[in-house]
């Protein structure tokens, strides 16, 4: 039987729509607070009185990193967007194909490398270090990093790469700064991050306290017949109402509780089932 392009496209649309309905039918509309169970609706924020990490503490972290760099003979470290960049600067930036980087030299303030069309946004976010070197679409960001190394007298020194630096960035820098000895920055970054300050511990404790309260509220919503998405959404809604950010939850019922990271199979809670709930949140990034 012959079929036209229009008929073929319509058939594909129908299949996709059926798949979407099957998947979405298992999801609970947690975004609508009117549908949240009473134990979740009763929750209120528990983030009052928290003290965010100050710029002074971040500068102290940079100073400590520079001390570790001196001890290890490292002339600079290069950091891409991620938790380490946030740790030293509070800058959150989505990593993309356009290189955005923080360079911490052995002495002095950090220097930044940024796509030219993102400069205005970068200046809104960057509070530590005002030297931002931009690159146009027809220019190399790695040449900008190499220029920073040259200005810092580190063109032929050990240059540490933070563990989240991607291969194409490392490879581009290797070509732009062939005399640099590219090494791991982990002795520096882990040397700072693995020892938590009192302020960090307080934020981690608050995130833990919020998570425990959310567990109690979410478990109070368990009922026979609910699916894993409904329970997971109750948990993330509880974390959000308590003031947690970046909430997440992995859920498994019955035999699927043996899957440490959950299963995509539809699940309905039955009396006597084991319930797996792996969940958490952050407070001020911790």
Question: What are these model-derived regions, one by one?
Answer:
Residues 2-210:
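A composition/biophysics-driven feature that prefers long, compositionally simple stretches
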Residues 74, 150, 178, 206-216, ...:
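Generic secondary-structure signature for well-ordered alpha-helical cores
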């Amino acid at each position: 039987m012959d079929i036209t392009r229009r008929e073929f496209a319509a058939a594909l649309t129908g299949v996709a729509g059926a798949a979407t309905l099957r998947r979405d039918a298992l999801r609970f509309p947690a975004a609508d607070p009117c549908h949240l169970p009473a134990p979740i609706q009763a929750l209120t924020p528990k983030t009052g009185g928290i003290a965010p990490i100050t710029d002074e503490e971040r500068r102290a972290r940079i100073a400590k990193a520079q001390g570790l760099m001196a001890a290890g003979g490292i002339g600079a470290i290069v950091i891409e967007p991620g938790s380490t960049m946030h740790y030293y600067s509070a800058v959150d930036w989505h990593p993309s194909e356009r290189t955005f980087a923080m360079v911490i030299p052995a002495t002095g303030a950090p220097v930044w490398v940024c796509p030219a069309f993102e400069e205005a946004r970068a200046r809104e976010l960057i509070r530590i270090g005002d030297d931002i070197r931009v690159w146009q679409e027809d220019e190399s960001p790695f040449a900008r990093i190499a220029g920073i190394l040259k200005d810092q007298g580190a063109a032929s020194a050990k240059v540490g790469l933070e563990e989240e630096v991607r291969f194409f960035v490392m490879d581009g820098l290797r070509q732009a700064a062939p005399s640099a000895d590219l090494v791991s920055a982990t002795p520096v970054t882990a040397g700072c991050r693995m020892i938590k300050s009192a302020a960090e511990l307080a934020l981690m404790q608050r995130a833990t306290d919020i998570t425990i309260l959310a567990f109690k509220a979410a478990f109070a919503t368990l009922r026979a017949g609910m699916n894993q998405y409904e329970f997971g959404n109750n948990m993330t809604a509880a974390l959000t109402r308590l003031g947690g950010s970046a909430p997440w939850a992995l859920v498994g019922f019955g035999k699927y509780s043996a899957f440490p990271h959950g299963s995509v199979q539809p699940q309905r809670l039955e009396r006597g089932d084991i319930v797996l709930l792996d969940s958490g949140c952050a407070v001020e990034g911790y």
